[in-house]
């Protein structure tokens, strides 16, 4: 609906019976305390209240949805490199965005390498990603032939079974770290599973990083317009600038992913969305998380 009545909104936010109907795993995987904490936090901000109602209860308010960046604009920015070519010794810092979607979505880690170019006085950016799809989701996907092609070519990873195992994500990060990739901040959606984030924190501490610093390296990024709007505008500026400030890896999925990404505009704010269930934008969500972390590191965002 475009709007919901105040009493309906309050029922969603307070009724434990409604929660149980929406989430049968309540009390098993997800606890009431999680809902209570998210709702208490959201009541302080109208945008966050919209996000909580959308994500926790599957009730959506609609805004104006428009296309964003087409794949044809991304292809000229792609180069024959991967994130492992962007090392600390060459001055590159890497921001990581993680979208641990479930079901038939992709399980994605996006990387954004950033370096200051002393000759031009500008920042340089490079984006790459790792993504997985569940075998069960692949078998039912309208995009199966396309996904199978990318899997065969090594661009998309296949995860057996019906459940994502977050060890795959940690293994990917470990491999990047061992190859000299300097990952400085990790953005994630706090409305998704906390297990991968707990594993991430444990791995960072195993590297000898103090627990307090680990907490500052792992940054929650909510997928609502208030958080995404600055990152969307920045990324759009980088991509559409006459000079090539940002490049993308040679992964052929990039143009398809960007074409899937639509923008919902409401109250002069923008957030990422998609047109059809089979459209995948998880990697782009991760890229926005990377941009958010970059701004956070540079003091442009306060949490």
Model-derived segments and spans:
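Beta-sheet entry/capping signal
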Residues: 1-3, 92-96, 106-108, 123-126, ...
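Metal-dependent DNA phosphodiester-chemistry modules and their immediately adjacent helices/loops
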Residues: 1-17, 207-301
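Acidic, metal-ligating active-site segments
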Residues: 103-119, 281-290
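Non-catalytic, compositionally simple segments
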Residues: 1-95, 104-106, 124, 128-131, ...
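Nucleic-acid-processing active sites and adjacent nucleic-acid-binding tracks
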Residues: 113-183
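Conserved helicase motor "Helicase C" RecA-like lobe of SF1/SF2 P-loop NTPases
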Residues: 193-213
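An acidic- and aromatic-residue-enriched active-site/binding cleft used to recognize and process polar
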Residues: 99-103, 114, 188-193, 221-226
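Short glycine-rich phosphate-binding loop at a beta-alpha junction
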Residues: 180-197
């Amino acid at each position: 609906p475009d709007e919901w009545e105040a009493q309906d909104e309050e029922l969603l936010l307070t009724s434990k019976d409604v929660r149980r109907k929406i989430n049968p795993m309540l009390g098993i995987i997800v606890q009431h305390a999680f809902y209570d904490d998210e709702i208490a936090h959201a009541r302080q901000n109208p945008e966050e209240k919209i996000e909580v109602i959308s994500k926790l209860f599957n009730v959506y308010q609609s805004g104006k949805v428009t296309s964003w960046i087409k794949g044809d604009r991304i292809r000229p920015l792609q180069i024959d490199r991967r994130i492992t070519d962007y090392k600390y010794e060459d001055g590159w810092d890497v921001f990581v965005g993680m979208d641990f979607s479930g079901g038939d979505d992709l399980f994605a880690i996006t990387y954004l390498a950033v370096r200051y170019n002393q000759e031009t006085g500008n920042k340089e950016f490079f984006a790459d990603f790792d993504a997985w799809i569940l075998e069960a989701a692949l078998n039912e996907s309208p995009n199966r032939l396309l996904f199978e092609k990318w899997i065969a070519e090594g661009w998309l990873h296949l995860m057996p079974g019906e459940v994502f195992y977050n060890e795959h994500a940690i293994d990917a990060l470990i491999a990047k770290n061992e190859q000299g990739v300097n990952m400085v901040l990790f953005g994630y959606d706090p409305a998704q599973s906390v297990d991968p984030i707990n594993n991430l924190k444990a791995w960072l501490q195993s590297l000898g990083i103090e627990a307090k610093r680990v907490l500052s390296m792992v940054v929650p990024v909510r997928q609502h317009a208030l958080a995404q709007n600055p990152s969307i505008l920045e990324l759009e500026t980088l991509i559409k600038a006459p000079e090539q400030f940002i490049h993308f890896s040679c992964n052929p999925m990039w143009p398809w992913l960007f074409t899937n990404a639509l923008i919902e505009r409401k109250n002069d704010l923008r957030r990422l969305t998609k047109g059809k269930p089979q459209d995948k934008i998880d990697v782009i969500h991760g890229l926005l998380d990377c941009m958010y972390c970059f701004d956070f590191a540079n003091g442009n965002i306060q949490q």
